[in-house]
A protein has these predicted regions:
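Acidic (Asp/Glu)-rich catalytic clusters
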Residues: 31-33, 55-60, 74-93, 110-123, ...
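N-terminal pre-domain/capping segments
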Residues: 2-114, 290, 294-305
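Histidine-acidic metal/acid-base catalytic patches
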Residues: 12, 19-22, 31-33, 52, ...
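Active-site beta-loop-alpha junctions enriched in small/polar residues
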Residues: 41-46, 69-71, 96-100, 132-134, ...
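Surface-exposed, active-site-proximal loop segments in enzymatic domains
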Residues: 97-111, 135-137, 144, 230-240, ...
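Hydrophobic faces of well-ordered beta-strands that scaffold small-molecule active sites
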Residues: 36-43, 66-68, 91-96, 125-129, ...
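Conserved strand-to-helix beginnings and helix N-cap segments that scaffold or border functional pockets
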Residues: 51-52, 77-78, 106, 141-142, ...
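Active-site acidic/histidine proton-transfer and metal-coordination neighborhood
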Residues: 12-13, 20, 101-186
């Protein structure tokens, strides 16, 4: 006789299986022009081991490359390049500043972007920027974009600005102003932040979303919701509305990239605690971060390759 616990577990697994099936089917009605490629990147966020262990695990899981913070320390730079070369991985870099003073912040940002872009070891697929701050003025934040446009034109590297809380593009209507005034602004699309900031799945901002989706060159594939930047497990049926919304946005980006024949990069970016919800007192994570990111890797590969 099946116990109630067993029944609930069987029901949950069956429902989850249906959700997985829906998103592992290839994207339809999306003609592919020559030149389209999908590159899926691994995050080192929350990884407990060494650089070599991280790169080895990413390669074994099927990732094409890694996304990692650019370091201003030469020894760390060499360690990163040695590890990706050893394991045959592509690379994308993260760059940012941290100071509360806009001029000092911009100086650090420029040093990081310039170092990542002009390194002589391995050309990055892209540079993703946590640009400016939400409390800097428009002109102060625009200086970050102006610098990256110049570096991108000089090097041919895609330099992108992430839709991220606390940064210049922290909310959809704020980002809309930048997009309206800077026609060649290119984005890393982490829409989970906008969902959290607006406390919605953005159904009331279709025009802004449509404009943003045309600017996306890189996706951070984490699923947020109305009350937070990360669901505890995207395979859980209670998150179906958020999952549906995020895949609809990502589908639109991929259709455009396929149509024009461009490389598309995606980072699977479910994070560790405190992004990952935990149990009280023990702080035990509610799900396995690495397993969720590999699930996202496999799902995205089947859908968008």
């Amino acid at each position: 006789m099946t116990t109630r616990k067993e029944f609930l577990m069987q029901t949950t697994l069956a429902t989850t299986g249906l959700l997985l099936q829906a998103y592992t089917r290839p994207l339809t009605a999306a003609p592919v022009r020559s030149g389209y490629q999908l590159k899926i990147m691994a995050t080192d966020w929350g990884f407990p081991g060494t650089l070599d262990e991280y790169c080895a695990k990413a390669k074994a899981a099927g990732y094409d490359g890694i996304e990692i913070w650019w370091s201003l320390e030469p020894a760390r730079q060499n360690a990163i390049f040695d590890a990706v070369a050893k394991h045959g991985l592509d690379i994308g870099f993260l760059c940012a500043g941290s100071q509360s003073n806009a001029a000092e912040h911009l100086a650090t940002f420029k040093e990081m972007v310039d170092g990542a872009a002009h390194n002589t070891r391995q050309k990055p697929l892209y540079i993703n920027c946590h640009s400016g701050r939400d409390y800097f003025s428009y002109e102060e934040n625009k200086a970050f974009i102006d610098h990256t446009r110049a570096v991108s034109q000089a090097t041919g590297i895609r330099i992108l600005h992430e839709t991220h809380r606390s940064r210049m593009l922290f909310a959809a209507p704020v980002a809309r102003h930048f997009m309206d005034t800077i026609p060649d602004l290119r984005l890393t699309f982490d829409v989970s932040h906008w969902c959290n900031v607006s406390e919605s799945l953005l159904a009331d901002q279709p025009a802004t979303l449509a404009l943003a989706l045309e600017r996306v060159d890189h996706i951070h594939a984490r699923i947020g919701h109305q009350e937070g930047p990360q669901v505890n497990d995207p395979r859980a049926p209670e998150w179906s509305a958020a999952v549906d919304a995020h895949f609809a946005w990502w589908d639109a980006v991929i259709r455009r990239k396929r149509a024009v024949g461009e490389v598309m990069t995606i980072l699977t970016e479910f994070g560790p605690p405190d992004y990952m919800p935990t149990l009280p007192y023990t702080r035990e994570p509610l799900a396995d971060q690495w397993a969720i990111n590999v699930y996202m890797l496999e799902t995205l590969r089947k859908r968008y390759a």
